[in-house]
Every structure is written in C-alpha cells, then in structure tokens.
Regions:
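Short, small/acidic-rich helices and loops at N termini and domain boundaries
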Residues: 1-74
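The Walker A/P-loop phosphate-binding site
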Residues: 60-174, 401
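Cytosolic-facing regulatory segments adjacent to core modules
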Residues: 98, 133-229, 299, 359
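Structural recognition of the conserved hydrophobic beta-strand(s) that form the central parallel beta-sheet
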Residues: 153, 234-235, 279-285
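Short acidic/His/Gly/Ser-rich catalytic and metal-binding motifs that mark active-site loops
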Residues: 160-164, 241-247, 290-293
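C-terminal regions of RecA-like/P-loop NTPase motor modules
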Residues: 173, 177, 181, 214-230, ...
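A structural motif corresponding to the C-terminal end of an alpha-helix
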Residues: 198-205, 269-281, 311-313
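Phosphate-binding/switch loop-helix module in NTP-utilizing enzymes
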Residues: 205-273
Length: 402
C-alpha cells in the first residue's frame, strides 16, 4: 500500500491495480486484494514502471529510422571534430587510451578475464582514475588527475570493504597487503589517509547488487544519472542470476531461454542504455576454459555467450603471460628496454578503432591495482609501433589531445 500511495502522490493513477476508494464493487476489490497479497513489491513496482515506459515509447518521438543524406550535418561534424577530437576521459595506464580513445560517451566496453586475473582490480582502477582528482605517482608524488567525473560502480560479488581497500591501494600506490595487515613502510600510512580524503570528496557512487534483474540494473543506472549526474558506469559483471531467470520466465510466460540468449539480452540492454542516456559503460565477463590454449583470443573465449561481443564497442581480455609468450618475446626482452611482462591484454574488437588483433604487453601490480602496458605486439609476436596518446581534461566534459 505504501508503494502504491507513493506512486499516487506523484500523480500516477494506480487504481487499476488497487482502488482504496472502491466500496461498491466487492468482486473487484477482492480480486485486487488477492493480487496484492500474492505479488511481491518488486513485481508491483516493475509493472507500474513498464506501463510508464510504454507511454514514453509511444508518445516521445524517436529519431531512429529516418531517411538521411550523407551530407546532413557534415559541416557541423567537421567543425566539432576540429574543436574536440572524438575522445573521452582517459582510462588508467599507458597505451590504453591510444587503443580506446578514452572512455567515450555512448559506448560499451567489455574487459574480461579468467577468475583471479584482474577483472575487478582493473575496473576499480578505472573507477578511481575517472572519479578522483588526485593520485599518487611513484616518481612525482601526489599529482593532479583531471576533473573528477561522476561515476557509478555496481559490484555483484565484492562487498564494500573489499572495494574500499582496493581503491585506497590504487590511489595511494600502497600495496593492499600492507593495508590489510596494518604494516606500513615509510610514508605509506599517510598516503592511505590522503587516499581516503580524496575518495571522500570524489563523485564515486558504489552499489552492491549480488542478485539482480535486467530491470534492477536499468533502474539503478537511470536513478544515478538523474540524482547524481553520473556519466560513467562500471558494472562488474555480465552474468546470469536467479532474479534474471525469474524475470525472463515472467516476461515470456514461463518459456525458458538459454543462458547465451539471456547474456546477449543483458549486454544489448547495457548498450541501449549507453546510447539512450549518453553515458559510458564498462563491464566484464568471465572466460571459458579455452583461454589457456587459444592463439587468437577473441569473443569465442567469453563464458556463456560469444554473442555478448555483438553489442560492444571495445572488447579486451586480460590473460596471464605463459612460457610461450616469453619465448616469442625473447629478442625484445633481451634488449632490456622493457620489464618482463606478467600480463597480456588482448584487444579483439575495436569499433572505429585502429588497433585490434593485438596484445598490450603489460606489467601488472595486483597489490596496487595498477596495470601498465609497456609495448604492443600482434597475436603472432610482431612488434607494433604505437604512441602513448595523452588525453587532456581541463574542464568537466571537455577533452583534448596532447
């Protein structure tokens, strides 16, 4: 009753679900009361929200499907690219922004990994790099870091305390083990204290969502766009849940869908939300067992459904370096120009991007969540010449190239 009253107070007529003023039609009153008693509050809320969405879809004009000419808006686009290149706020790490052109609005990026190889840690790093205005640099100390954009982090596995210590480690450059064991060296404790202060003034919002439906994810993203001005969303990670299975069964009248279809629907909805609300979304998946032997690490390694990759703008896998990699890189490493990599990041899809079918050879410090690509090769170990693109953020939402 409280939920229905709240909708009614907002001017939404819910009398077709329950009409408290009805005293004459006893049969209708009994049917409505039985429905309320046997329906949980989430289903009631979703039903009302779906009805509102249908009204919006019917009466709000859409620009999709209109016939257009190749020269429509061409001069304006050319001038816009002169003033502001097609880049987004920078992500963390050398070479990453050369490949991705930053976290671009209306784009969906997917970064997957086997369990335990850094999917969450790299996402935490990007959340902090987007949302914090200072970060500790091993060479220069505390340095300014952009404009601290509003960012939402939805975690499906880790609790808040687990996320917090990873964030402290990344921002301060202090190994998480030192934080967890309360055994600091030198000025590390002071750096962690400052990291906590930086997070306190940031615009980072964290939501724990261990069991979720498609509607839950959509509502949380829309709510934080509306209430917190969020433009960057990190969702860890794309998977099936009991609630999604129940939701799909309810929508399809009990028809069961395969896991790959459900995962495709979730990734498709994330991409639609990115387009509809003009936000950037970063997500991830687990990998299947084939990652150990694959020489072409592409979408076929995605656990559950390779069709997830159909909806994304950028696809990457984080993979461990094996002996075969070190043998293939022997000549490069012998020159002592680079440290020995312990991680390789495979870029298998890059819509409107130059680099794909490549590895970013990376030195990963799991303790501080800092993954630093050093150089790039093809999947066949051929060295690629690649510059480290610097994206400059001077004003909120305004980016340029250095």
């Amino acid at each position: 009753m409280t939920l229905l009253r709240a909708f009614d107070n907002r001017g939404i007529d819910v009398s077709h679900l329950y009409d408290p003023d009805n005293i004459l039609d006893t049969k209708k009153k009994q049917i409505q009361e039985e429905w309320l008693d046997n329906t949980n509050i989430a289903e009631i809320a979703n039903k009302i929200v779906e009805e509102v969405d249908q009204i919006v879809a019917t009466h709000v004009s859409q620009t999709f499907g209109e016939v257009q000419r190749p020269n429509d808006g061409a001069l304006e686009l050319r001038e816009k690219l002169k003033q502001r290149p097609d880049v987004g706020i920078p992500l963390y790490g050398p070479l990453i922004n050369t490949v991705t052109r930053g976290a671009r609005l209306r784009k969906l990026y997917l970064r997957s990994a086997p369990s335990g190889y850094g999917k969450t840690r790299t996402m935490v790093a990007d959340v902090c790099y987007i949302g914090c205005d200072e970060i500790y640099d091993e060479m220069f100390g505390w340095i300014k870091n952009g404009t601290a954009e509003p960012v939402l982090y939805i975690t499906t596995e880790q609790e808040l305390e687990e996320i917090q210590t990873m964030m402290w480690a990344f921002i301060s450059g202090v190994d998480e083990d030192h934080i967890m064991n309360n055994r600091y060296e030198g000025d590390e404790e002071a750096r962690v204290d400052k990291a906590i202060e930086i997070l306190a003034r940031s615009k980072i919002y964290i939501i724990e969502l261990p069991d979720f439906s498609l509607r839950d994810v959509e509502n949380l993203i829309k709510q934080n766009i509306r209430e917190n001005g969020v433009k960057y969303v990190c969702f860890d990670y794309i998977m099936t849940s009991l609630k999604i299975l129940e939701e799909i069964a309810s929508r399809t009248g009990g028809v069961k869908l395969r896991e790959d279809n459900i995962l495709f629907m979730l990734s498709r909805r994330l991409k639609d939300l990115a387009n509809e609300y003009g936000v950037f979304i970063l997500s991830g998946t687990q990998l299947n067992a084939d990652w150990r032997d694959s020489e072409t690490p592409d979408q076929n390694l995605l656990r559950g459904a390779k069709s997830i990759a159909d909806s994304i703008d950028l696809g990457m896998h984080i993979l461990p370096v094996v002996q075969k990699d070190l043998e293939g890189l022997e000549t490069v490493l012998a020159a002592n120009t680079f440290d020995k990599p312990n991680v390789k990041i495979s870029v298998y899809k890059n819509r409107r991007g130059r680099y794909k079918g490549v590895y970013l050879r990376t030195k990963a410090d799991y303790g501080t969540c800092r993954f630093r690509p050093m150089f790039a090769t093809t999947w066949d170990y051929e060295i690629i010449t690649i510059e480290d693109l610097k994206i400059i953020t001077e004003d909120e939402g305004a980016f340029g190239l250095e």
